[in-house]
RNA sequence: GCCGGGGUGGGGUAGGCGGUUAUCCUUCGGGACUGUGGAUCCCGCGACUCGGGUUCAAAUCUCGGCCCCGGCCCCA
């Protein structure tokens, strides 16, 4: 019988786990300095939580099942919807705005490819019930600062505003559904398909030309002047532009000045309502997008009261990829204790336990190998010290401590040993 | 789903135009260096995805299944 790891999943060994925990720790600390606190939702939810949000077609990409009580459940394919559900169930009546963050794994039944896994992790946050350019700027600042804290170079923040684009479509009286479709194509960046669709939908030449111009507009905040020129009499879009300007100004106060205005960012999701942003690491090619976010309204879709949220999520695995951390030989244990003779095993056990109680990670030679082999193993473990318990030393109330890095050795009084070692670890 | 590549000792690989003892590195176990290692040497454990076919003979050719990886479609 051959049992192996399911397709699209990964095993993480010691060194990689250590790296992931480290990144996780930096993100937690940074989010918490912005006043966010962690929430956790179940790994499986009701299936309809996801179909209501994204449509029936996603069922084919969801790991779903009927439980023993006949309920249709699903392994969560993303975390935005569970967070909205949690808010609606538990926090709807609480004072606003509410800041929360989350970290967890998601599951999708899709064809794996480079960087595309069936189990993947997201680290994200939501600021619920306080939409304003100031709030939005702070969310973007948090995303940017997190990456700076991690020491990531070469990332680009791209910011768009759906209100500008929807203001044009609204003036053409394009129905909601068609607008959503158009947004999807814009997000895809397929210019030809967009032209074809706008023609099919019979958007006026003026608006069509304007849309094409806008989605190709990219650059620093100064391009907003160009955008204003393009917009002319589209009053709804101008209002959104004003909002965008306010965001830009506020970002400056947060110290965020390195970003791209990019109206081609549409996110392709119908529940987004205003600011949208994505973060890229260009050198990663097809997997360059490590973060997506913006302002949206989802709770109403699930039957709650209308409330807008601004948030984002890092693709944790993409982020790890971008950081490219080395998996150096890691120290499995600080101290390796070796009984030189069988008679010294009890003492070796006592020493090991004392070290552990003092917060020093320690392991004991349990295989009965000779000293030579045991020392070799200590090296394999990357142990900083080896402690040798021999009959001679024990008789004298001492213990031999070998520094594995310096290849030096000393004999210490038994009762001073723990403190000495602890002080050097 | 379509296209392409692949599946060889615990890990990584060579072999692949058929030849009958399957290569190399590494991991692991034992031994030699006489209570002390990171080197070296010796011995050992351990393998050709499953099924069928062709053949005196198949890891090597062929048919089918299963599995994995990459590209496309899709990507909440």
From Swiss-Prot:
Enzyme class: ligase
Record key words, sorted: Aminoacyl-tRNA synthetase, ATP-binding, Cytoplasm, Ligase, Nucleotide-binding, Protein biosynthesis
InterPro entries named among the record's database cross-references: aa-tRNA-synth_II (IPR006195), aa-tRNA-synth_II/BPL/LPL (IPR045864), Anticodon-bd (IPR004154), Anticodon-bd_dom_sf (IPR036621), His-tRNA-ligase (IPR015807), HisRS-like_core (IPR041715), HisRS/HisZ (IPR004516), HisRS_anticodon (IPR033656)
Catalyzed reactions per annotation: tRNA(His) + L-histidine + ATP = L-histidyl-tRNA(His) + AMP + diphosphate + H(+)
EC number: 6.1.1.21
UniProt-listed NCBIfam families: hisS, hisZ_biosyn_reg
Protein name as it appears in the record: Histidine--tRNA ligase
Species whose genome carries this gene: Methanothermobacter thermautotrophicus (strain ATCC 29096 / DSM 1053 / JCM 10044 / NBRC 100330 / Delta H) (Methanobacterium thermoautotrophicum)
